[in-house]
């Protein structure tokens, strides 16, 4: 199996460029190999109706792809008048993942919107979105602290995500599109920096997988996510 010079346990080249857009409180271009996602964090001084008057905040996410982010053009979902099931699933996953590491009571009655827009897709767009959105969220929270709008940091720890799978009978880390398309098993792991799991998604595309294979994929995912935490920290230190 060819991985463009990568070992089975290697991430693709990872880049996180902060302040990629000037207007949002947080804006990051995250690159997992040829997958590129712009993640922005925008603060609004309001909360959803179910939280009004409760003194607590909210973190939510939206996800989309440019029409030609993939090999062939896809119509904009706005033109179709509805979001696809895949889009809804991914943006809910992003929102859940970031809420898992946020203390909403420290946000006050405000919402942070995480917008993840895929400008080029080559596998792992949801995992790249979660990983980049965390960095954007840190910048947005930092802006609130500097402005004196909040007095304590609501972020409890970091969160990141990576894909793993079984390709040609072998456990591999951080699948690109070609690998994902031929994978016998495809899994996504979302974890916090304390080593806890936020979400595990796994599907056998062909033969069912064994407990041993799942353990091998989990081990790879944990190794990869720990590396992603380092990339996040390095980006935030620049």
UniProtKB/Swiss-Prot annotation:
EC number annotated for this UniProt entry: 2.7.7.56
MF terms (GO), sorted A to Z: 3'-5'-RNA exonuclease activity; tRNA binding; tRNA nucleotidyltransferase activity
Broad class of enzyme this protein falls into: transferase
Annotated Pfam families: RNase_PH, RNase_PH_C
Record InterPro entries: ExoRNase_PH_dom1, ExoRNase_PH_dom2, ExoRNase_PH_dom2_sf, PNPase/RNase_PH_dom_sf, Ribosomal_Su5_D2-typ_SF, RNase_PH, RNase_PH_bac-type, RNase_PH_CS
Superkingdom, taxonomy of origin: Bacteria
Reaction(s) catalysed (UniProt annotation): tRNA(n+1) + phosphate = tRNA(n) + a ribonucleoside 5'-diphosphate
Assembly and oligomerization: Homohexameric ring arranged as a trimer of dimers.
Identification of the protein by name: Ribonuclease PH
Encoding gene (name): rph
């Amino acid at each position: 199996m060819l991985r463009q010079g990568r070992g089975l346990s290697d991430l693709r080249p990872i880049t996180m460029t902060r302040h990629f857009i000037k207007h949002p409180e947080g804006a990051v271009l995250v690159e997992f190999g040829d997958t590129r996602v712009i993640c922005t964090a925008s603060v609004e001084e309001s909360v959803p109706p179910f939280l009004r008057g409760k003194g607590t905040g909210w973190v939510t996410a939206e996800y989309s792809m440019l029409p030609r982010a993939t090999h062939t053009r896809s119509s904009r979902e706005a033109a179709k008048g509805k979001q696809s099931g895949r889009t809804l699933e991914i943006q809910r996953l992003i929102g859940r993942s970031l809420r898992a590491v946020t203390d909403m009571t420290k946000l006050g009655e405000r919402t942070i919107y995480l917008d993840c827009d895929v400008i080029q897709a080559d596998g792992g767009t949801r995992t790249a979105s979660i990983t980049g959105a965390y960095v954007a969220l840190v910048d947005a929270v930092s802006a609130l602290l500097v402005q004196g709008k909040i007095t304590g940091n609501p972020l409890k720890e970091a969160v990141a995500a990576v894909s793993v799978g079984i390709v040609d009978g072998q456990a591999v880390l951080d699948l690109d599109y070609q690998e994902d398309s031929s994978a016998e098993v495809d899994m996504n792991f979302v974890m916090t920096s304390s080593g806890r799991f936020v979400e595990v998604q796994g599907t056998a595309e062909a033969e069912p997988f064994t407990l041993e294979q799942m353990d091998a994929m989990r081990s790879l995912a944990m190794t990869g996510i720990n590396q992603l935490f380092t990339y996040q920290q390095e980006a935030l230190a620049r």
